[in-house]
Amino acid sequence: MITVADSNLERPWGRYEVLSSSDIHQVKNVYVLPGKRLSYQRHEKRAEHWFIVTGDARIILDGDSFEMSAGDSIDIEIGVAHRIENIGSEELVFTEVQTGTYFGEDDIERLEDDFGRS
């Protein structure tokens, strides 16, 4: 069964909203403020696909850094360390499609975090 959620969750780097979820997927729109970045993290139970909707991003995957912009997308496999940073002057928006067996926020192993979260 697919659930359409109405959650808009604030974070120190911006916010995200869950668009839909089921036992095998979750879809979010993520909004990152200019100059902010998410934690450098990895997941044990889910892979992610990111599609950049608007803005400019710096992506780090297992230590490799590259830039992406609107229309670009990337796959992040389970266990791969990753981070996204808004390098533009406007809000960065990307759609995140998660697939796997568990989508809770406790499936985040933070390797580095600008906001002191573990």
Where do the language-model regions lie?
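Short beta-strand His + acidic residue motifs that chelate non-heme Fe in jelly-roll/DSBH
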Residues: S39-Y40, I59-I60, I76, H82-G88, ...
